[in-house]
Structure formats: C-alpha cells, structure tokens
Amino acid sequence: MGSDTSESNNDWKTQLNIPKKDTRPQTDDVLNTKGRSFEDFYLKRELLMGIFEAGFEKPSPIQEEAIPVAIAGKDILARAKNGTGKTAAFVIPTLEKVKPKLNKIQALIMVPTRELALQTSQVVRTLGKHCGISCMVTTGGTNLRDDIMRLNEPVHILVGTPGRVLDLASRRVTDLSECHLFIMDEADKMLSRDFKVLAEQILGFLPERRQLLLFSATFPVTVKEFMVKHLKNPHEINLMDELTLKGISQFYAFVEEKQKLHCLNTLFSKLQINQAIIFCNSTNRVELLAKKITELGFSCYYSHARMKQSERNKVFHEFRQGKVRTLVCSDLLTRGIDIQAVNVVINFDFPKTAETYLHRIGRSGRFGHLGLAINLINWNDRFNLYKIEQELNTEIAPIPSQIDKSLYVAEDSSAVPIPFPLESLPITANAPQQPANAEPLPPQQTQVQFHAPPQQQQQQQQQQQQQQYQQFPNQQQQQYGQPLMPQNYQQQAYPPQPFPSKGFPQQQYTQAPQ
C-alpha cells in the first residue's frame, strides 16, 4: 500500500517537460553540498514542478543553506560567490511563502540595475509558472503610467530598482501594507552611497513585522551598519572560503595601448569562444571599441548606461539568445547578469578596484562551470594588477602562447542551458506575460550559428584588419558616425582570418612588467 502511494506521488515527475541535462563539469563552488534535494525542503508541488522544468537538479550550497532558513521566517545576511545560485536561493522561498489567493504585493525584490531586474523577474516567472503567482517588474527609464496601470491588476511579487519603487510608493500607487518579505540582491551595491537612503525610505512603507533577506558577494561596512539597525537576530551565511570562482582561469597580457586591438583580434582567432563579454572603463570607449570590432568583421553588440532603456533591453535579450558572440559594455552588466553561454571575459580596460574585477570576471564560469578571464594591461595598470592580486588572494598569470581549451571549453557545446524560455523575455518592462496554464514553450537551441562569407569577402576583411588595427585608439573625440544597434549588424564569419604570420607578440606582453 505504501509503495503504491509513493509511486502515485511521483507520477507528476513523469509529466514534466525537463530540459536536456547539463553535462558540463562543475567545481566545488556548487558541488560542495550536504546532499539534500529540493524535496527535502517540503516545497509545494507546483513550485517543485517549476524548479525541475527550469533544469535544476540539486540545490547549490547557498540554496541549501538559505532556503530552509528563509522559509522559517528568519532574517538572512548571505554572502556567496557570483554565479553560485543566489537568485534561486531567495526566489524559491519567496514563491513558497507567497499566497496566490491574497491579491496584494507580498514580496519586494530590489536590485541595482534594470537588466538585473528583468532577469530576476523572469526567474520568478519561470520557477513559479505553476504557482498562479503574478510578478511585476518596475524600473526607471520606462513609462510610469504603464506601471501605475499594471498595479491595478493583482501583483504578488514586485521586482524593481530603488528609484522607481520609491516613486510608486511615495505616490501611494503601490500598496505595501501586506509586503512582509523584503529582499536585496547585490546588497553591497544597494546599500552604497547611491542607494542607501532610498532603501531606508522604502522600508518606511513596509509593515513593522517583516523579513529581510540580504544577498551579495561582498559586504562592506555600510552593510554591517544596515544589518545592526534593521535586521533582527539575522542568520549569517558565509560561503566565501575564497573570493574568486574556482572554475575561472585568469591571465594577463602586457600590451601597449596602441596594440590592444591587434591583441584582441589575435585572441579572437586563437580562442574557442562560445560567447564573450568585453569590459571598458568608459561609455565612450565602449562605443569606439564596438565600432572597431565590427569593422574587423566580428558581429558585436554594445551596452552602457547612456543608452535608451529600450535599446539596452534589446541588446541584452538578443545577446542572451545568441544572436552574436561578443558584447562590449561598461560596468553596467557586472552585477548579477547570468548568461550561461559566456565562457570568456576580457578586460580591455583593466578595472581600478578589486570589487569591480571580481564582479566582471564572475560573468563567466557561471554555476560552477569553467570560464576564462583575460586582462589587457599596460604600464599604468601594473600597480592595480598587483593590488587586486593581493586583495583577492589570487594569482593572475601571464598569458601563455596557447591556452588549454579544457580550462574553459565545454566538450559538448549543446549542453549549455538557457535558464528560461527566451520567447517570453519582455522587451519592455511589463509586456503581457504568458498565462500560468499556457503550454510550455519549446526548448531553445543554444548553439550560435555563424555562416562564413565568400572567400573574396574574407580577403577584403583581412586587408581591412591590417589597415585598421593600428588606428585604435585615436583621439576619442573623432567622429565615427551613428552607433550601430542590433538591427544594423550583420552576422560575420567567426573567427576571421588571423593576421598573416603574426601570432602573439610574446616579447611585448607575456612577461611581467619590471
């Protein structure tokens, strides 16, 4: 009798639309667990269905530690590495605690950037698609009137950036009287000088009886002050035995500024890149570099804070879909952005602080997988390189002439998962959402297809490369015409032909600066 009941209880699992298993090797960052399963947390079946259909198999260490404590109602201060499953660690208990029949905002998730708000809201919708829970995302740069109209409909979970959330609360448009769960992702940024006052003002609109969950990879003094003031006997989780992810191999190339573009082109021709993110230190250099990369024959998008929100959304979503291999951006996308297909991060401009460096390289090697971080440094960066190595207690090695592919390349590229159906990604913040009872969307192919151009076009590209690579960077005030947006880019061959008889200029940048 008992076995029959057990079999009937597991029948629902056979009906799930589970995606292809991710067969890539993983590191102890996500494998060093106590052996629990998601069923051990006694989650409701509808939530378990969403978890398994999203491709989750076992909880990561941060999920294992945080989920039962959050469900129990305790405040949490959690510190874990980038890319180890922090988002699901607070989304899962949130979905478990929210009551679908109560048409009030019951949970508020605050994040520092608009892209992270869109991503987090989609994770909520994906994991909770069988729960009958409504999630709304609200960020600056979108139409306020649309948000006000959306709030006339039932909303259970609100995801947003601090400025817009405070604006809606101050106008008394958002009813937070039943919002007993307040979550801050990237809490160190949320409690920085830019956002701390806003966060404390928002707390004033929440009920006295509330639960606070703070998640981040780094916790400066400002977070400690906030914790003492607002958290009640919090449960502290610290899974940071070391700061950098174990699966990321870090190298530096010592190269003169005028040779950086040549070096970048050589890297493109030598590395096996699935997708790459290239970071620059200013918006001007982001646009300039994206223009130059496109002229070299690579398909390339760029994103920075001065772009319109609709353009940023389009770039972000199309890059996630694999429309291009390369994204050039400022530090706008260093926080929390989870793109599983990214296996290479290149710091075209070396960051000034260890915190920025940590968040940048964390865009590769997501969820315990392998990744590669390459830093192009010049003579002026040598002190920052040493300082960051000391602060993070890590080694950034000189780049070898050949990088072992096993350090960053998955044996089966088709195993790279997409965290949620890409067709459901909204271009605007509050596009109409798919009904909870709708048929599941078909799984996406994650391989990026590129078609080689004719041989004559390849030769022309190669000639252009030889003429152009030495021209970067010229005067930054030089006009390069209108910036190219995604609809204007053409898919190009990948990789283009390398420079004839030119490999890495080893004598220039593989030796440490004296």
Curated annotation (Swiss-Prot):
Keywords for this protein: ATP-binding, Cytoplasm, Helicase, Hydrolase, mRNA processing, mRNA transport, Nucleotide-binding, RNA-binding, Translation regulation, Transport
Residues noted as binding ATP in the record, renumbered to the chain: A80, K81, N82, G83, T84, G85, K86, T87
Reaction catalyzed: ATP + H2O = ADP + phosphate + H(+)
One of the protein's GO biological processes: mRNA transport
Ranges for region Disordered: 1-31, 427-514
Keyword presence, ATP-binding: yes
Gene Ontology MF terms: ATP binding; ATP hydrolysis activity; RNA binding; RNA helicase activity
InterPro entries tied to this protein: DEAD/DEAH_box_helicase_dom, Helicase_ATP-bd, Helicase_C-like, P-loop_NTPase, RNA-helicase_DEAD-box_CS, RNA_helicase_DEAD_Q_motif
Gene3D superfamilies named in the record: P-loop containing nucleotide triphosphate hydrolases (3.40.50.300)
Keyword Hydrolase carried by entry: yes
Purpose: ATP-dependent RNA helicase involved in mRNA turnover, and more specifically in mRNA decapping. Is involved in G1/S DNA-damage checkpoint recovery, probably through the regulation of the translational status of a subset of mRNAs. May also have a role in translation and mRNA nuclear export.
UniProt-recorded name of the protein: ATP-dependent RNA helicase DHH1
Organism from which the protein derives: Kluyveromyces lactis (strain ATCC 8585 / CBS 2359 / DSM 70799 / NBRC 1267 / NRRL Y-1140 / WM37)
